[in-house]
Amino acid sequence: MDKLIITGGARLDGEIRISGAKNSALPILAATLLCDGPVTVANLPHLHDITTMIELFGRMGIEPVIDEKLSVEIDPRTIKTLIAPYELVKTMRASILVLGPMVARFGEAEVALPGGCAIGSRPVDLHIRGLEAMGATIDVEGGYIKAKAPEGGLRGANFFFDTVSVTGTENIMMAAALANGRSVLQNAAREPEVVDLANFLIAMGANITGAGTDTITVDGVKRLHPATYKVMPDRIETGTYLVAAAVTGGRVKVKDTDPTILEAVLEKLREAGAEITTGEDWIELNMHGKRPKAVNVRTAPYPAFPTDMQAQFISLNAIAEGTGAVIETIFENRFMHVYELHRMGAKIQVEGNTAIVTGTEKLKGAPVMATDLRASASLVISALIAEGDTLIDRIYHIDRGYECIEEKLQMLGAKIRRVPG
């Protein structure tokens, strides 16, 4: 397994381009299955999960055409099997997203129960209950979800999500696009990635209103037509590089991004002492060499502070002036990175769903291990400011969510290199 070696102490300075959002690209790729012709999706990030999703299509008999800029053309009319096999699905939770489109378009689906990051219990029961409300019959047996649409296809339904679920909202919204009649999704997720998926479906001819609010209305149509669509920028990648610059007292300009989908994070960075300027598709952060001030953070569904930025702000607080509380309300067991940061000298106490972080002027390089995607980003950030070398193991977690992380950090002046395991 590859490792990263980071020598701390370099102040980040420069410009980088932000990649397309993985959490938008994956549902959009799944949604191409709803179309009755070829669809082109552009601005895909070069990430393992994206490759896995494209490989899954290949296993189903679809042959995606990929160009060197990683835009992909998919023609779902060539599909030969409606099974998403375990060996592919086990590595990627987002594979559950093909369930709704396949049942809606082809009348049946068989999808292995998914794998992915080990964060708390992330049940798929909302997906199943939503499809059942639309008339599907579903059995879970042998580790597979087997779903069948009723005679005449899925029916529009009113469905209330007990808990806000991004992938649940996406799956049911996709299925509803081709259902007979109107579906109303209540307590729906409001994330920008849900809006991006809705915009893609609309580009193919779907009739959807309310995306970005907690009530989404979908009037089913008979068919979705070919379209070309560009995936939105990755707001979590954007935020991660801004925090990295803030921690090192540096300056960074991130381009090809969207400041309007990151307001809660930018607000906290300003609170930490960063000077932030924005344009239509760029954000610049400048710390002017100063040490950040500790901030209190509480994660909550969009538009509040995102859970996927929690770990990065623990790293910021770890070297900040003062003490900050980080409260995690979305996932359980999402403080695994704290025990690795302790090895670097961070002063963090975890009490239930709260981490109390007392800033220290210096962290020390140490061998550490990535436990999940965002936790690994926090280790990279802390390593940038630590004295000496930090060796980060199990970085395949990082590669699941960050495109070319070492190249981008090198462009900003970081001393970072990848070594084969």
UniProtKB/Swiss-Prot annotation:
Its EC number is 2.5.1.7. The modification 2-(S-cysteinyl)pyruvic acid O-phosphothioketal is found at residue 117. One of its GO terms (cellular component) is cytoplasm. GO terms for biological process: cell division; cell wall organization; peptidoglycan biosynthetic process; regulation of cell shape; UDP-N-acetylgalactosamine biosynthetic process. It catalyses: phosphoenolpyruvate + UDP-N-acetyl-alpha-D-glucosamine = UDP-N-acetyl-3-O-(1-carboxyvinyl)-alpha-D-glucosamine + phosphate. GO terms for molecular function: UDP-N-acetylglucosamine 1-carboxyvinyltransferase activity. It is found in: Cytoplasm. InterPro entries: Enolpyruvate_Tfrase_dom (IPR001986), Enolpyruvate_Tfrase_sf (IPR036968), MurA_subfamily (IPR050068), RNA3'P_cycl/enolpyr_Trfase_a/b (IPR013792), UDP_GlcNAc_COvinyl_MurA (IPR005750). CDD domains: UdpNAET. Pathway: Cell wall biogenesis; peptidoglycan biosynthesis. Phosphoenolpyruvate binds at residues 22-23. UDP-N-acetyl-alpha-D-glucosamine binds at residues 93, 122-126, 308, 330. Its main location: cytoplasm. It comes from the Bacteria. The active site is at 117 (proton donor). Keywords: Cell cycle, Cell division, Cell shape, Cell wall biogenesis/degradation, Cytoplasm, Peptidoglycan synthesis, Pyruvate, Transferase. PANTHER family: UDP-N-ACETYLGLUCOSAMINE 1-CARBOXYVINYLTRANSFERASE. HAMAP family: MurA (MF_00111). Belongs to the EPSP synthase family. MurA subfamily. Cell wall formation. Adds enolpyruvyl to UDP-N-acetylglucosamine. This is UDP-N-acetylglucosamine 1-carboxyvinyltransferase. It comes from Pseudomonas fluorescens (strain SBW25). The gene is murA.
